[in-house]
Each structure stands twice: as structure tokens, then as C-alpha cells.
Amino acid sequence: MNTTNNTSKLVILGLMTGILLLMAYTPLGYLNIGPLAITFNVIPVAIAAITLGPAGGAAIGAVFGMTSFLQCIGIGGSSAMGAMLFSINPFLAFVQRFVPRMLDGLLLGYIFQFVRRRTDAYMASLVTGFCSAFLNTVFFMTALVVLFGNTEYMLSLIHISEPTRLQLI
């Protein structure tokens, strides 16, 4: 019984990884708008978090983070903003692309488990799906502002002149 359960989890993990890679390396996963892109790659992350729990969500989130980082250096597509951030600081670009996506998957697993204890699976899945896009956006943009908010590139995007700097409260 335990072997079957582990095999099922491994198959789901592989399937979600494959779907995510397909979406990341084809136009299915991103809708580019200016320097940013709306991503649909959070869908496999949410499904993995719902079906496999926090560890599965974090694993698929890590795959999403890696594909996002690889696009900064032109592997499997390109991200103009990612390339610019990579040229500013490669390590911070990795942190900004990888950590929010992995954290998103981890927290989605916990959110699903928390809501599932209090309601049915349908409502828990609905809440988790909403939180997926919301948390991805919040984590990604927060990391972007915290790590790169005072760079010339970011200041030029939001049209702030050189003497003015963003202050974190």
C-alpha cells in the first residue's frame, strides 16, 4: 500500500513538472506585457500543493523558480527584465526568481491543509487557487522591490529621478 502511494506521488510530481516545463518553454505559460509577464505557471504549482502537500508544492515551485531564473540568461525563452536584473546582480536575480516561487508552493500546501480541515475539498481548492496567483504576485513583487528597488533600472521603470530613492519603512 505504501509503495503504491509513493509511486502515485512520484507520478503526480513528474506530471506536474512536465506540464510546468511545457508551459515555461512555450507561449502557454506567459502573457508578456511590457517588461513584466503574467504567468500561468502557478497552476501546476497549485495543483501539486493540493495533491502532494507542502513538500510537493515547494518542489514544483522550485522547478518554476529555476525556469524563471534560466529565462534571465536566455535559456528556454527570454525575460528582458530578468536579463537586466541578472546583469545588475546574478545572485540577487536568482533569489528574486527562485525563492518567491518555492515559498508560494510551500505555503499553498499549508493553506490547502488548513482550509481543508475546516471545510470541504472544493472550497479548500478554490481558496488555494486564489491564493496561488495572489501570493506569487505579492512575493515576486516584494522581492523585486526589496532587492532591486533602488537600482537605476527600477527607478527608470517607475520614472523616479536619480536624487529620489525609495525608502523602505
Enumerate the predicted regions with their spans.
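Hydrophobic transmembrane alpha-helices
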Residues: M1-V63
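Juxtamembrane/transmembrane-helix interface segments of polytopic membrane transporters
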Residues: C72, G109-Q113, T137-E152
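Single conserved hydrophobic/aromatic residue that forms the stacking wall/gate
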Residues: I158-I169
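Internal alpha-helical transmembrane segments of multi-pass membrane proteins
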Residues: F114-V138
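Central hydrophobic cores of alpha-helical transmembrane segments
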Residues: A59-S68, S125-S132
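Mid-bilayer segments of alpha-helical transmembrane spans in multi-pass integral membrane proteins
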Residues: F98, M102, L106, A133-T142
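Interfacial aromatic-anchored transmembrane helix boundaries in multi-pass membrane proteins
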Residues: A24-A37, V63-L106, Y110
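Residue-level signature of transmembrane alpha-helical entry/exit and packing/kink sites
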Residues: N5-M16, I38, V42, A93, ...
